[in-house]
Amino acid sequence: MKLKLFPFQAAGHGQVLVSEDDKILIKPCIKSEVDFYKTCNDNITLYNWIPKNFGEWMPSSRDIEGINPIAESVAFSLTGKAIILENILYQMETPCVMDIKLGKQLWADDAPLEKRKRLDAVSRSTTSGSLGFRITGILSWDRTNNTYIKRSTAWGKTLTDSDVVEGLNDFFVSCSLSQKARLVESFLNLLKLFEVDLSESYIELKSSSILFVYDYSSLNPTYHCESNVVLKLIDLAHSRWTKNTIDHNTLIGVKNLIHCFAMLLKNE
């Protein structure tokens, strides 16, 4: 399996690789994320919200022979763990991607004290603390210049309660008013469904994210199809199933996201 750099990574720490046929991703991770994915099967309520996984990636020389030097160096640097995931952008011509981190508390219970202090400071100074969510990256299509506009994690940290809706609007920067309204409505409906499923799941999701995706190339003035509108739960390294505990820390962020998307829709 030949690999290349994944060009649509909106946020995250490790460089993701993608197969030459664009069907699967190789995502660097830690052991706890590999272990958590092993517990995700079609018997769980959140199954459809989690990208399909195909097990742990065990690299061989065949995986990286012949790819460009940058991707080769990345692949060789994966001395730890990596997991094989479906590429939810597969067959999208112009995917637009937004990564949003959920929760006011951003650290797992086993995090050392210094990490807790650092992440608590991040939460207090951003919308993570006030709203329970924070935009960590956006890749949106700029039709005027025929290129992508990127919004970074650092940019997301500058947003406040008063302008975060405007920040969300950047995800739809090249859409017409009607396209944007229908996309926002589609994502709003998905968020409401996700909220219901999450509220019925005994799970703890610390520092997880929601990935929003749509294909700009599929839009047209009469757009009404949701097949290229995707919402997925990602970054599950610090997730665990619980016996009888609902994750209110994450739900706060989801509820506020629903409110903000409703405001986006109302503004149209």
UniProtKB/Swiss-Prot annotation:
Entry keywords, A to Z: ATP-binding, Cytoplasm, Kinase, Nucleotide-binding, Nucleus, Transcription, Transcription regulation, Transferase
BP terms from Gene Ontology: inositol phosphate biosynthetic process; phosphatidylinositol phosphate biosynthetic process
Domain of life of the organism encoding this protein: Eukaryota
Positions that bind ATP: K27, E86, N87, I88, D99, D235
One cellular-component annotation, GO: nucleus
Keyword Repressor: no
Subcellular location per the Swiss-Prot or TrEMBL entry: Cytoplasm; Nucleus
EC number(s) from the headed UniProt entry: 2.7.1.127, 2.7.1.151
Main location: cytoplasm
Keyword Cytoplasm annotated: yes
Residues involved in substrate binding: T127, S128, G129, S130, L131, G132, F133, R134, I135
Reactions catalysed according to its record: 1D-myo-inositol 1,4,5-trisphosphate + 2 ATP = 1D-myo-inositol 1,3,4,5,6-pentakisphosphate + 2 ADP + 2 H(+); 1D-myo-inositol 1,4,5-trisphosphate + ATP = 1D-myo-inositol 1,4,5,6-tetrakisphosphate + ADP + H(+); 1D-myo-inositol 1,4,5-trisphosphate + ATP = 1D-myo-inositol 1,3,4,5-tetrakisphosphate + ADP + H(+); 1D-myo-inositol 1,4,5,6-tetrakisphosphate + ATP = 1D-myo-inositol 1,3,4,5,6-pentakisphosphate + ADP + H(+)
GO molecular function terms attached to this record: ATP binding; inositol-1,4,5,6-tetrakisphosphate 3-kinase activity; inositol-1,4,5-trisphosphate 3-kinase activity; inositol-1,4,5-trisphosphate 6-kinase activity
Sequence similarity: Belongs to the inositol phosphokinase (IPK) family.
Summary of the function given for this chain in its UniProt record: Inositol phosphate kinase with both monophosphoinositol and diphosphoinositol polyphosphate synthase activities. Able to phosphorylate inositol 1,4,5-trisphosphate (Ins(1,4,5)P3) on both the carbon-3 and carbon-6 positions to synthesize inositol 1,3,4,5-tetrakisphosphate (Ins(1,3,4,5)P4) and inositol 1,4,5,6-tetrakisphosphate (Ins(1,4,5,6)P4), and then to subsequently phosphorylate and convert either isomer of InsP4 to inositol 1,3,4,5,6-pentakisphosphate (Ins(1,3,4,5,6)P5). Also converts (Ins(1,3,4,5,6)P5) to InsP6. Also has a role in transcription regulation.
Protein's recorded name: Inositol polyphosphate multikinase
Designated gene of the protein: arg82
